[in-house]
Amino acid sequence: MTEPIFMVGARGCGKTTVGRELARALGYEFVDTDIFMQHTSGMTVADVVAAEGWPGFRRRESEALQAVATPNRVVATGGGMVLLEQNRQFMRAHGTVVYLFAPAEELALRLQASPQAHQRPTLTGRPIAEEMEAVLREREALYQDVAHYVVDATQPPAAIVCELMQTMRLPAA
């Protein structure tokens, strides 16, 4: 397999952490669409949202997805990447999609402990636990629909990588 592997899921599910470890295990390159967008725009996610609103952010997110989708690469996508049908179609057509599932309570705990919390603008203006429940209600079907593989993201990252390597029959680097 040389096609890109796209990691999808809500904020805090481990897309970046697991994606980096999976890329290392495969000898692939790793890229995070949010970080790619920050480098190309010179703005943080919060700055893009403040300057261009969520529609502008989603447009930039789609552009980043297409720019980074190259062979031998693991791509951590933004939590809302699945909101646009064109992104879901693109990922399914151009790679393998892995959904890292974690319950809302777990996601909220991780986000509260995250040092990057200030860079992640609130989607709803509600407390993080309520927000994550609302986000999963809105997006769960989209994550499930786009995914080739669904993985329990409450496991340690190394266990998730091991599971993916076995399930996807991926050769180690």
Curated annotation (Swiss-Prot):
Binding site for substrate: D34, R58, G79, R139
Organism superkingdom: Bacteria
Regulation: Inhibited by chloride and sulfate ions.
Cofactor note: Binds 1 Mg(2+) ion per subunit.
Pfam family, one: SKI
The reaction(s) this protein catalyses: shikimate + ATP = 3-phosphoshikimate + ADP + H(+)
Top EC class, one word: transferase
Predominant location: cytoplasm
Obligatory cofactor(s): Mg(2+)
Molecular function terms, GO-annotated: ATP binding; magnesium ion binding; shikimate kinase activity
Entry keyword set: Amino-acid biosynthesis, Aromatic amino acid biosynthesis, ATP-binding, Cytoplasm, Kinase, Magnesium, Metal-binding, Nucleotide-binding, Transferase
This protein's domain notes: The LID domain closes over the active site upon ATP binding.
Family: Belongs to the shikimate kinase family. AroL subfamily.
Protein name: Shikimate kinase 2
Organism: Dickeya chrysanthemi
Lineage of the species this protein comes from: Bacteria, Pseudomonadati, Pseudomonadota, Gammaproteobacteria, Enterobacterales
